[in-house]
């Protein structure tokens, strides 16, 4: 018996396909991209007029919520913009925010955007978790900021000793003058909204230029995939950090673009903090809910055991959306089952794919699929180029949502685009009728001594899924060797004995998919050494490089090596 699915208006999935003689494939939507504004503040002004009392931002304040309406946000953005103009900030001297998501951060962002001053949200990990502040110093050397904001000077004291620009910890909101209107009038499609940082395999920060055109065009692309936003303004309860494009562009943008409400969730998907998220979701019913796979996994025990939480969470929900990493199949299946048991119908569990350089949405799967690796197809306005690489396809992209390049790094910018102007994403896919299946990062893949290619991304995802919840993460080794090995970061409650007991059951279909040996890594991944990104994801190449001696031990007769029969 087929199950009913909650009725939600979703976009089309048809795609035009062109195949060239050189083996490359081009994909694009047959539907035209809808009109979009020159600057996102036009949407803020629209909603301040159309729904002035609607909540734009809310942040918990004890048992209540501190709120900012659309009318208040516009008024305060203009005042903040006046202050930033008085500080003589510019693209050469931008605003940086070192602390995380809060209402003050949001208003600084809006104020800077209103008067055309670029801002850069910096990962708090570079200030609070780092011990050498190397990435923070590198970012400041690249950007040369004119002003920095922190939510708490005491908490950020050590980091502030590393920087030289002016620092504020409270908003300054003078009365706006005609200078604000003049600056706003000069803002156009090519004006830089923000610099978002991403790290390559070297771990060196790159400042991705994000323009008004990129952000506005991408929001119209998202609306083409998820047109229900135009029928009902979205309500979000969101913890994801604004220094990442997923929340800072995708989520924040879809709220501003469509007149929604953004409830800032100060929880995180980790012990001791997930409870804050649960408390918020008991009170606020989202209509669109985004999380990373570990976030959904952390929520599951609470959704299983708390009927009141389940009822509120699923009551108004139109779409569940995951991104940022591979979603374990069991998490996908159980979230769908809980939704059905709670409200008698399935809720669309959708996903997409993008990058900091693409503002971010480049693919969207807005139809049901059993394979969680299916990232969907391009929305209107996006053109994809799929280039054969071994037995997968390297994806490249062109469209108004693509960055013009990396700030003050012309060599990296030139390397990022091919001869036809397509941005090189560096990700591997397979193209099937149901959509594009993500296979991992091409830079991580390697050959065994037999010449057989190992696709690391897919193998890592299968390994983590098979060994859940024992394994926190894994690094795949074996380049130039005869067999594949695994360097394992165990979860806090697991041990090597449990891992050994389950190694023999890991499924394989050949030498490139078979883990022949494994070793447990006792030292956690290092942020300062570039082994771990601020998102908590593992940099495969950095771990292999820094722990070369352990790679050698993995391929020795050491007693610590776990052999897979």
Where are these regions (language model features)?
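Conserved AMP-binding/adenylate-forming core of the ANL superfamily
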Residues: 32, 56-110, 127-134, 186, ...
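Conserved pre-ATP/AMP-binding loop-to-beta segment of ANL
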Residues: 52-55, 176-197, 203-204, 228-235
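Conserved AMP-binding A3 loop
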Residues: 66-71, 193-220
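Conserved AMP-binding/adenylation subdomain of ANL enzymes
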Residues: 216-235, 243-311
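Conserved C-terminal "lid"/linker of ANL adenylate-forming enzymes
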Residues: 446, 472-477, 506-565
């Amino acid at each position: 018996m087929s199950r009913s699915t909650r009725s939600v208006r979703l976009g089309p999935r048809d795609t035009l396909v062109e195949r060239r003689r050189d083996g490359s494939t081009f994909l694009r939507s047959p539907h035209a991209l809808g009109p979009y504004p020159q600057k996102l503040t036009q949407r803020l002004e629209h909603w301040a007029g159309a729904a002035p009392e609607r909540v734009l931002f809310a942040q918990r304040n004890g048992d209540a919520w501190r709120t900012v309406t659309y009318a208040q946000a516009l008024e305060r953005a203009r005042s903040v913009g006046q202050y930033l103009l008085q500080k003589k900030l510019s693209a050469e001297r931008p605003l940086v925010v070192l602390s995380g998501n809060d209402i003050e951060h949001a208003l600084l962002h809006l104020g800077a955007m209103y008067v055309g001053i670029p801002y850069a949200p910096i990962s708090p990990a570079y200030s609070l978790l780092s011990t050498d502040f190397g990435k923070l110093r590198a970012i400041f050397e690249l950007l040369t900021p004119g002003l920095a904001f922190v939510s708490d000077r005491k908490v950020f004291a050590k980091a502030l000793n590393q920087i030289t620009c002016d620092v504020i910890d409270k908003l300054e909101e003078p009365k706006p003058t005609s200078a604000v209107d003049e600056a706003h009038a000069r803002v156009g499609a090519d004006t830089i909204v923000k610099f978002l940082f991403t790290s390559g395999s070297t771990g060196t920060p790159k400042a991705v230029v994000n323009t008004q055109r990129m952000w506005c065009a991408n929001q119209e692309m998202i609306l083409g995939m998820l047109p229900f936003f135009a029928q009902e303004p979205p309500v979000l309860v969101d913890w994801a950090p604004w220094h990442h494009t997923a929340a800072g562009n995708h989520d924040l943008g879809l709220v501003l673009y469509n007149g929604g409400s953004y409830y800032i969730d100060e929880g995180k998907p980790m012990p001791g903090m997930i409870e804050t998220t649960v408390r918020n979701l008991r009170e606020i019913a989202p209509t669109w809910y985004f999380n990373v796979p570990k976030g959904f996994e952390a929520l599951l025990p609470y959704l299983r055991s708390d009927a009141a939480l389940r009822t509120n969470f699923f009551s108004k929900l139109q779409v569940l959306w995951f991104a940022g990493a591979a979603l374990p199949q069991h998490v996908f299946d159980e979230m769908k089952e809980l939704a059905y048991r709670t409200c008698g119908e399935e809720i669309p569990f959708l996903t997409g794919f993008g990058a900091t350089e693409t503002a971010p949405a480049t693919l969207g799967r807005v139809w049901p699929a059993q394979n969680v690796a299916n990232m969907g197809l391009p929305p209107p306005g996006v053109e994809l180029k799929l280039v054969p690489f071994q037995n997968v396809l390297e994806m490249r992209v062109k469209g108004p949502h693509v960055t013009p390049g990396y700030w003050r790094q012309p060599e990296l910018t030139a390397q990022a685009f091919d001869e036809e102007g397509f941005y090189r994403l560096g990700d591997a896919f397979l193209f099937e009728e149901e959509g594009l299946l993500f296979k991992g990062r091409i830079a991580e893949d390697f050959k065994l001594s037999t010449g057989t290619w190992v696709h690391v991304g897919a193998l890592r995802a299968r390994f983590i899924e098979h060994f859940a919840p024992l394994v926190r993460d894994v690094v795949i080794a074996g380049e130039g060797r005869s067999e594949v090995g695994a360097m394992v970061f165990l979860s806090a409650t697991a041990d090597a004995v449990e891992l050994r007991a389950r190694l023999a059951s890991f499924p394989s279909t050949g030498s490139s998919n078979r883990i022949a040996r494994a070793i447990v890594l006792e030292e956690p991944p290092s942020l300062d050494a570039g082994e771990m990104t601020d998102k908590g994801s593992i940099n495969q190449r950095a771990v292999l490089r820094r722990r070369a001696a352990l790679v050698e031990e993995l391929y020795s007769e050491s007693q610590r090596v776990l052999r897979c029969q």
